[in-house]
From Swiss-Prot:
Belongs to the CWC15 family. This is Spliceosome-associated protein CWC15 homolog. The modification N6-acetyllysine is found at K18. Identified in the spliceosome C complex. Component of the PRP19-CDC5L splicing complex composed of a core complex comprising a homotetramer of PRPF19, CDC5L, PLRG1 and BCAS2, and at least three less stably associated proteins CTNNBL1, CWC15 and HSPA8. Interacts directly with CTNNBL1 in the complex. Component of the minor spliceosome, which splices U12-type introns. It is found in: Nucleus. PANTHER family: CELL CYCLE CONTROL PROTEIN CWF15, SPLICEOSOME-ASSOCIATED PROTEIN CWC15 HOMOLOG. Keywords: Acetylation, Coiled coil, mRNA processing, mRNA splicing, Nucleus, Phosphoprotein, Spliceosome. Involved in pre-mRNA splicing as component of the spliceosome. Component of the PRP19-CDC5L complex that forms an integral part of the spliceosome and is required for activating pre-mRNA splicing. As a component of the minor spliceosome, involved in the splicing of U12-type introns in pre-mRNAs. Residues 104-128 have a biased composition (Acidic residues). It comes from Bos taurus. Residues 125-167 form a coiled coil. The gene is CWC15.
Length: 231
C-alpha cells in the first residue's frame, strides 16, 4: 500500500541533514524500502533434496520397497474376505453335486433347504403382489372419493349461484309460492314540483284552477295585464 498520501510532519531541509554541512548540496533522504534486502543467497538444507542427496539416492530400490509394502498391506486384508466368502459358501451341497459313490439310501432325493428357500421366495413374491394390489385399491378408492367430493362441491356452488340469481331479481321472486307480494310504486321525478317547468308556448293555455305561483311572469295577474294592455 502506498504512503504517498500521508502528511509530512518533518519536511526536508537542505544542508541540515546528517553529514550535510554545505547548504548548496541537495538533501538526501532514503526510505527503508530503498535499502538493499536479501543480501545472502539461500542454500538447500539437508532435508530439502540437495543435489548431493539426490545423487546418492537409489530410487529403484525405494520404488521396489514401496511396492512390496503395498502388496503386504493388500494381502493382510485378503484372509478376512476369504473367510467371509468360505463361510457363505459352506452350505449343504446340492444333490447333483454329490458323487454317486457318496450317496446314502437314507438321504432324501430332494434338497429340503432349496425347497424351503424356493417356498420362502414364492411366499415373499405373493405377499408383495398382494400388498401392491391393496395399494392400488386404496389409491383408486381415494381418487373416487376425491372426484365425488369435487362433484358435490360443484353442485352446491351451482345451487347457491342459482338461489342468488333468483333472490336478486324481484320479478322472479313474485312467481315463488313463499315470496310475499310486493307493491311497486313509480317514483316521482325530482323536478315534478318545481316552479320553472313546462315553460314552452301553449302549455299553460289549458284551463286550470287558480293557484298561487311564486313567479311574476306566470301569475294570473300578469297574464291578464298582458292580454288587456299589450296585445
Amino acid at each position: 500500500m502506498t504512503t504517498a498520501a500521508r502528511p509530512t510532519f518533518e519536511p526536508a531541509r537542505g544542508g541540515r541533514g546528517k553529514g550535510e554541512g554545505d547548504l548548496s548540496q541537495l538533501s538526501k533522504q532514503y526510505s527503508s524500502r530503498d535499502l538493499p534486502s536479501h543480501t545472502k543467497i539461500k542454500y538447500r538444507q539437508t532435508t530439502q533434496d540437495a543435489p548431493e542427496e539426490v545423487r546418492n539416492r537409489d530410487f529403484r530400490r525405494e520404488l521396489e520397497e514401496r511396492e512390496r509394502a503395498a502388496a503386504r498391506e493388500k494381502n493382510r486384508d485378503r484372509p478376512t474376505r476369504e473367510h467371509t466368502t468360505s463361510s457363505s459358501v459352506s452350505k449343504k451341497p446340492r444333490l447333483d453335486q454329490i458323487p454317486a459313490a457318496n450317496l446314502d439310501a437314507d438321504d432324501p432325493l430332494t434338497d429340503e433347504e432349496d425347497e424351503d428357500e424356493d417356498f420362502e421366495e414364492e411366499s415373499d413374491d405373493d405377499d408383495t403382489a398382494a400388498l401392491l394390489a391393496e395399494l392400488e385399491k386404496i389409491k383408486k378408492e381415494r381418487a373416487e372419493e376425491q372426484a365425488r367430493k369435487e362433484q358435490e362441491q360443484k353442485a352446491e356452488e351451482e345451487r347457491i349461484r342459482m338461489e342468488n340469481i333468483l333472490s336478486g331479481n324481484p320479478l322472479l321472486n313474485l312467481t315463488g309460492p313463499s315470496q310475499p307480494q310486493a307493491n311497486f310504486k313509480v317514483k316521482r321525478r325530482w323536478d315534478d314540483d318545481v316552479v320553472f317547468k313546462n315553460c314552452a308556448k301553449g302549455v299553460d293555455d289549458q284551463k286550470k284552477d287558480k293557484r298561487f305561483v311564486n313567479d311574476t311572469l306566470r301569475s294570473e295577474f300578469h297574464k291578464k295585464f298582458m292580454e288587456k294592455y299589450i296585445k
